From Swiss-Prot:
Alphabetical keyword list: ATP-binding, Carbohydrate metabolism, Glycogen biosynthesis, Glycogen metabolism, Nucleotide-binding, Nucleotidyltransferase, Transferase
Xref: Gene3D superfamilies: Hexapeptide repeat proteins, Spore Coat Polysaccharide Biosynthesis Protein SpsA, Chain A
Oligomeric and partner information: Homotetramer.
GO cellular component: carboxysome
One GO term of the biological process aspect: glycogen biosynthetic process
Protein's recorded name: Glucose-1-phosphate adenylyltransferase
Record InterPro entries: ADP-Glc_PPase (IPR011831), ADP_Glu_pyroP_CS (IPR005836), GlgC_bac (IPR023049), NTP_transferase_dom (IPR005835), Nucleotide-diphossugar_trans (IPR029044), Trimer_LpxA-like_sf (IPR011004)
């Protein structure tokens, strides 16, 4: 796989994940207690021996830059591997920001063309899955494809959110429709037994959806982006237009895959990691590990706690609390008599000293972490939050959507999201 260049699309402003993207690019959003979203595609690349990786991003790229530079030094040992962020920039030749996924790649085509590779692997930065890209690329080569799409069978409920396609008997894409609705959606229904599904599974999942993951022959991608500047998005324009003109093949991926680009899907995917005995996605795979930055934190300390079906990152301090079906990020601090249930706590970037905590409390300020006697249920608490004593974050009025950013929180799809660094005073009820 040395002749493959991977390009990870960092996405736009991440408005569907706001406020988690308020101060960070979407690929830098924390995941599963200690990782970041970008670790998923980068780890999949490394495990497939793909070591030339660009990450394209447009907004708030400082923390993403820092994470990648501190984590992935692929050139050690005198190799030519790298993981590098390419941020959108205004130039005299191009006075515009990225206009879409394809336009993002087009704006850096001058750099991408310099690499002597056979294929370009286009990936997304906000999916949770484990894939062997070497099998994907080998399928592309074996079929002599110009473009290969990674696809999965899908049910009708979710089908309209994806690009759908029809295939011939050889697996070639003969029709492609991006996020069809109504009659157009029904027209894209196919017999998915051609993908190897049994009749029962095929009846439940009668659509073939694109995962937004592509392999292009080098010259094909350069030609498409150079000669069709009006096409700014891969899924909406480039792929539908190219599907009939080029040998476009489909590669079946029939394992766990989740688009976690919204607050609701992000929350559900994180909490699903706690399911027993078999979570839909596991970070405990020695054959295909997910990498992240080594932080050298101390072990987590639990003092008379009751913890059930939860994931707790390293370096946490928990005192006489109850934690149920939750994910706690690194350096989380939870004081006595707290109840954490169905919650995602992202932890902290640093420790407050004991002296500072006592000083803050003496001065009427709220220390970092979860104060004693507090309850957090069905919520996301971003990093470095200061939650006071006897706080109730339970969405007591069952609100679906609310913007209270000035008070330190928002509600999305019924999930309370406490913003990064927020201060929630003692006795607050949300």
């Amino acid at each position: 796989m040395k002749n493959v260049l991977a390009i990870i699309l960092g996405g736009g402003a991440g408005s569907r994940l706001y406020p988690l993207t308020k101060q960070r690019a979407k690929p830098a959003v924390p995941l599963a207690g200690k990782y970041r979203l970008i670790d998923i595609p980068v780890s999949n690349c490394i495990n497939a021996d793909i070591n030339k990786i660009y990450v394209l991003t447009q907004f708030n790229s400082a923390s993403l830059n820092r994470h990648l530079s501190q984590t992935y030094n692929l050139s050690s040992g005198f190799g030519n591997g790298f993981v590098e962020v390419l941020a959108a920039q205004i130039t005299p030749e191009n006075p515009n920001w990225f206009q879409g996924t394809a336009d993002a790649v087009r704006q850096y085509l001058w750099l991408i063309k310099e690499w002597d590779v056979d294929e370009y692997l286009i990936l997304s930065g906000d999916h949770l899955y484990r894939m062997d890209y070497s099998q994907f690329i080998q399928r592309h080569r074996d079929t002599n494809a110009d473009i290969t799409l990674s696809v999965l069978p899908i049910d009708e409920k979710r089908a309209s959110d994806f690009g759908l396609m029809k295939l011939d008997g050889s697996g070639r894409v003969v029709e492609f429709s991006e996020k069809p609705k109504g009659d157009e959606l029904r027209a894209m229904q196919v017999d998915t037994t051609i993908l190897g599904l049994d009749p029962v599974a095929a009846a439940a999942q009668p659509f073939i959806a694109s995962m937004g993951i592509y392999v292009f022959k080098r010259d094909v991608l350069i030609d498409l982006l150079s000669h069709h500047p009006e096409q700014t998005d891969f899924g909406k324009e480039v792929i539908p237009a190219a599907a009939t003109r080029y040998n476009t093949q489909a590669f079946l991926f029939n394992d766990y895959w989740e688009d976690i680009g919204t607050i609701a899907s992000f929350y559900e995917a994180n909490l699903a990691l706690t399911q027993q005995p078999s979570p839909p996605f596991s970070f405990y795979d020695e054959q295909a590990p997910i990498y992240t930055r080594a932080r050298y934190l101390p072990p987590t300390k639990l003092l008379d706690c009751q913890v059930t079906q939860s994931i707790i990152g390293e370096g946490c301090i928990l005192k006489q609390c109850t934690v149920q079906n939750s994910v706690l990020g690194i350096r989380s601090r939870i004081e006595a008599d707290c109840v954490i249930q169905d919650a995602l706590l992202m932890g902290a970037d640093f420790y407050e000293t004991s002296e500072l905590r006592h000083q803050n409390r003496a001065n009427g300020k709220v220390p970092m972490g979860i104060g004693s006697g507090s309850t957090i249920r069905r919520a996301i608490v971003d990093k470095n939050a200061h939650i006071g004593q006897n706080v109730q974050i339970v969405n007591k009025d069952h609100v679906e959507e609310a913007d209270r950013e000035d008070l330190g929180f928002m509600i999305r799809s019924g999930i309370v999201v406490v913003v990064k660094g927020a201060v929630i005073p003692d006795n607050t009820v949300i």
